[in-house]
Amino acid sequence: MADESDMRNELNDMQARADQLGDESLESTRRMLQLVEESKDAGIRTLVMLDEQGEQLERIEEGMDQINKDMKEAEKNLTDLGNLCGLCPCPCNKLKGGGQSWGNNQDGVVSSQPARVVDEREQMAISGGFIRRVTNDARENEMDENLEQVGSIIGNLRHMALDMGNEIDTQNRQIDRIMDMADSNKTRIDEANQRATKMLGSG
């Protein structure tokens, strides 16, 4: 009888330990799911901010392009005014930056999404679950569902990271263009001011 009682107690202890491990494992998958969902939300916010920043850079580049067009008109007017005043005309194409033609930017919204790659986690889900079933109870069902969601979100995070990298590369190239345009516009404005000052002084 004592042996049976000891065995029963041992089995109860093993069952209690198994239940404890099951509860801890379930809680672990819940924490994992919460963490990747928070990461996904942060990724979405970052993509939105990058998109807004891209729109601002687009407006800045359009403004620089408009200044370029306005300067061409101003340089033409200064040349015409110089001719009327009997001054030696200075062709616009001799001005620094005057011959530069700016068109539509070469960078735009990423037109293609990265190819979807089926990794080991997704392959496990396709082949029948993320965990090896022991008790086949509701806890294991939830653990499997949680891990499936974690795997899916991690795949989305990978794609987000690729999109972020592409967008940042695009914006870096756009910033370089804007800097070049700003330098060119400043040079042309300075030279136009010098010409105008010379005309006024000669008058």
From Swiss-Prot:
Concerning Pfam families, the annotation shows: SNAP-25
The cross-references to SMART domains, in alphabetical order and at most eight, read:
t_SNARE
In residue numbers, the region (Disordered) covers 1-25
Q: What InterPro entries does the database record attribute to this sequence? A: SNAP-25_dom, SNAP-25_N_SNARE_chord, T_SNARE_dom
The record's GO molecular-function terms, alphabetically, read: SNAP receptor activity; syntaxin-1 binding; voltage-gated potassium channel activity
Where is it expressed, tissue-wise?
Expressed in several regions throughout the adult brain, including the mesencephalon.
Which CDD domains does the UniProt record give? SNARE_SNAP25C, SNARE_SNAP25N
Compositional bias per record (Basic and acidic residues), positions renumbered to this chain: 1-11
Keyword Magnesium, does the record have it? no
Record key words, sorted: Cell membrane, Coiled coil, Membrane, Repeat, Synapse, Synaptosome
Classification via PANTHER family: SYNAPTOSOMAL ASSOCIATED PROTEIN, SYNAPTOSOMAL-ASSOCIATED PROTEIN 25
The protein's name: Synaptosomal-associated protein 25-B
Say which species the protein is native to: Danio rerio (Zebrafish)
Gene name in the database record: snap25b
